[in-house]
A protein has these predicted regions:
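Short, glycine/serine-rich, charged loops/turns that create anion-binding
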Residues: 1-2, 79, 119
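Conserved HGGG/HGGXW glycine-rich cap/lid loop of the alpha/beta-hydrolase fold
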Residues: 1-32, 36-37, 47
Length: 132
């Protein structure tokens, strides 16, 4: 869902002025290790953009190696620890995705959470992200 495909348009628009990379955040079990993994994939010095969970990872990268980050943009994120209610709600979603029910999860949970009648252009963008 929120992987490199989400940033295709931005990467294309910036290709003449910047080398853009989307860090891989899978395969590790905590924010510090995710940040280390992304940092290890990055050039020696780099600008950093983080959206939501990516912003949390970006803040950890800055904590670990501030001298490597030339500038940063953090969007729709916060520095606070996840509250227990959010953690509890996420676990059934993780289990559903692992059980091969990702499409059902997207239809029943994510679409309802992110679709809006007030901004129909966002609905189209979300559909493109979900179904491609």
């Amino acid at each position: 869902m929120c992987d490199a495909r989400m940033y295709t348009s931005q990467i294309e628009a910036l290709k003449d002025i910047a080398e853009c990379q989307v860090g891989y955040i899978g395969g590790v079990d905590n924010t510090a290790n995710i940040a280390r993994q992304v940092r290890d994939q990055a050039p020696e010095n780099f600008a950093l953009v983080g959206l939501s969970m990516g912003g949390i990872v970006a803040m950890e990268i800055v904590r670990q190696a501030p001298e490597r980050v030339t500038r940063r943009a953090l969007m729709d994120t916060n520095p606070k620890a996840e509250i227990d209610e959010v953690k509890a709600a996420r676990q059934p979603q993780i289990e559903a995705a692992q059980a091969g029910q990702l499409e059902q999860l997207l239809r029943e949970v994510m679409v309802l959470r992110y679709f809006t009648s007030h901004q129909p252009h966002l609905n189209w963008m979300i559909c493109v992200l979900i179904w491609h």
